[in-house]
A protein has these predicted regions:
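C-terminal hydrophobic helical "lid"/dimerization subdomain
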Residues: 1, 200, 250-254, 293-357
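Local beta-strand N-terminus motif with an aromatic residue
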Residues: 79, 168, 214, 235-236, ...
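Conserved acidic E/D residue at the C-terminus of a beta-strand in Rossmann-like folds
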Residues: 199, 266, 290
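Mid-domain Rossmann-like dinucleotide-binding core that forms the NAD(H)/NADP(H) cofactor-binding site
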Residues: 139-221
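Cysteine-cluster motifs in flexible loop/terminal segments that predominantly coordinate metals
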Residues: 38, 75, 85-135, 139
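Glycine-rich beta-strand-centered segment in the early N-terminal region that forms part
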Residues: 20-35, 48-97, 138-141
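Short, flexible surface segments
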Residues: 75-78, 167, 258
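Glycine-rich cofactor phosphate-binding loops and adjacent beta1-alpha1 units
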Residues: 163, 188, 205-285, 347-352
Length: 357
């Protein structure tokens, strides 16, 4: 099968690999029908994910059809349409029992797919702990509607939940990339008094204004002043930092009112400074974290009910054997791209040389 592979820092390559097989009785093999590229894939490419293993197939956003299941898998069966959770989790350790599946203590727990074990930018993927890592897609929900459930939408859902948003709050979201917009969709469910999105890209700012007219939009240069003008207590009650740029961490806590909650959703390429003398007296509560993907079934129900729709984010589609072009467009933010879908079962004829060690 074709599989997009992490070779070394700065280099991914499309290679031929064997179709994965069941290794554990709790595994499932999924035929990938639709996948996507995430900014975390770019972090691997750029060397910002030290745990990433060279030689693995990248990709952790995907939906597909179950092909095989291990003897102990009971929740799914061959032929089922499923979302694949970005997190691998046992469901039994201290953290899993408390809903913190990102911190699963299993050796392959947490973010493993497409990082430490083979992921889904391929024709097939092996999913450990399939009873927990796969969720049924309702018949009325398309692959496109379900595509982002297992990662960026689950990230936004988790971030909105831990941010303790109330209906009286002014909420600032920094960043209107794919994860930022997914976060926005989940914050909208909380019905806060006011939502402000800070985004430097004119195209993405325009997207937010057109799609979500009830949301206020600011640019980074004027964000603090904009927030002060549009909040009641000297800043935002809740700030969600989803951009991960060089200056956005400071912008996040700088725009927060005293005693606010600042939730760090972004993954940074470089260490960030925590200038405690400057922050003294603001009494901020910081929350950090990658996705704890334990809400996928609830998210799928919300999609089925028409309360969440991420399909406008999918601006481009490519067959798997054109994934290099898909990455070029996504990484360089060309052609108004927000999210790229990779069609795993649609492959244009091409000859790929097998890898020789």
């Amino acid at each position: 099968m074709l599989a997009y592979t992490y070779i070394e820092q700065g280099k991914f390559e499309l290679r031929e690999k064997p179709i994965p097989e069941i290794k554990d009785s709790r595994d499932a093999i999924v035929r990938v029908t639709l996948g996507s590229i995430c900014s975390s894939d770019l972090h691997i490419k750029h060397g910002s994910v030290p745990r990433a293993v060279s030689g693995i197939t990248v990709g952790h956003e995907m939906v597909g059809v179950v092909e095989k299941v291990g003897a102990d898998v009971t929740a799914v069966k061959p032929g089922d349409r499923v979302t694949v959770n970005v997190e691998t989790f046992c469901g039994e350790c201290f953290f899993c029992r408390r809903g913190y599946v990102n911190n699963c203590t299993d050796p392959n727990g947490g973010w493993a797919l497409g990082c430490r074990i083979d992921g889904g930018q391929a024709e097939y993927v092996r999913v450990p702990y399939a009873d927990r890592g796969l969720n049924h897609i309702p018949d009325t929900v398309s692959d496109e509607q379900a595509l982002l459930v297992g990662d960026v939408l689950a990230t936004g859902f988790w971030a909105a939940r831990i941010s303790e948003i109330t209906e009286d709050d002014t909420v600032l979201i920094i960043g209107a990339g794919p994860t930022g917009i997914c976060t926005l969709l989940c914050v909208l469910l909380k019905k806060p008094r006011r939502i402000i999105v800070c985004e430097k890209s004119p195209e993405r700012a325009r997207f937010v204004r057109q799609r979500y007219p009830e949301v206020l939009v600011a640019d980074p240069e004027n964000c603090k002043e904009f927030v002060l003008r549009n909040s009641d207590h000297g800043g935002a009650d809740v700030v969600l930092e989803v951009a991960g740029s060089e200056d956005t961490f400071r912008l996040a806590w700088d725009c927060a009112r005293p005693n606010a909650i600042v939730t760090i959703v972004a993954l940074y390429d470089k260490p960030q400074l925590l200038p405690l003398p400057d922050m003294y007296g603001k009494n901020l509560t910081f929350k950090t974290g990658g996705v704890d993907g334990c809400d996928c079934a609830e998210i799928l129900n919300l999609i089925e009910e028409g309360k969440i729709d991420t399909t406008p984010l999918i601006t481009h589609k490519f067959p798997l054997n054109e994934i290099e072009e898909a990455y070029r467009i996504f990484e360089n933010r060309l052609d108004g791209v927000i999210k790229v879908a990779i069609e795993g079962n649609l492959i244009k004829p091409v000859f790929v040389l097998p890898h020789t060690p």
